[in-house]
Amino acid sequence: MPAFDHFAAIAPIYARVSYSKRDVMREVASLPVRGKLLDVGGGTGRVASAIRDLVDEAIIADVSLGMLKEAPLSALKPVCGGSESLPFADGSFERVIMVDALHHVIDHAHSAREMFRVLKPGGVLVIEEPDIRTFGVKLIALAEKLLLMRSHFLAPDEIMKLFLNGEKKVKAEDGTAWVVIKKQVTPQA
C-alpha cells in the first residue's frame, strides 16, 4: 500500500501561502544571477515564484504530483522527481535551493550529493530549514511525528557535514537556518 501523500492533500492551501523570506534568500543565494535555478522539493513553486525575477529560468522538482499541479506553469517548469535521484545532468544549475524540505527526504546524504552534483562549479546551494535548535521547531518536529510525516530534522552543523566539498556557512534567525554551500571552481590544468 503506497504511503499517504500529505503534501498532495494540502497543496491547494499551501499554494496560497506566500514566501516571506525573499530578502534573506536573495542575500544567501547571491541573487540575482544569470542562469538557471533548481528548487528541490519546491512543491507548489511558492519560493521559486517569489524569486523568479532574479534568475533566467526556474525549475521546481518535487515527488508530489499534487503539489506540482498547483505550480504556476507560466513562470516555472515543474519536474516530478525525488531529491535522491535528480533527473538532470551534472553541473546544470547556477543556483540550487531546498526550502523547508530536507527534513522530509528519506536519505539526507544522498539528497545532498545529488544537489551538489547538479550545481555548476562556482554555483551556490542553499538549504533553508526550520532550526531544530529552537523550542518552537522542536514542537513542530513533534507534531509532524504525530501526523506520521516521517520527518527527521537536522541541526545546521549536521546539514553542513552532509557536504564533503565546498565553502560552507550558516545564517540563522527567527527559528530558521540557511546552510549555504558554494561549489569550488576547479582550476584547469
Name these PLM-found stretches:
Residues 1-32, 46-47, 67, 140-143:
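Conserved class I S-adenosyl-L-methionine
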Residues 100-101:
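Short catalytic micro-motifs in class I SAM-dependent methyltransferases
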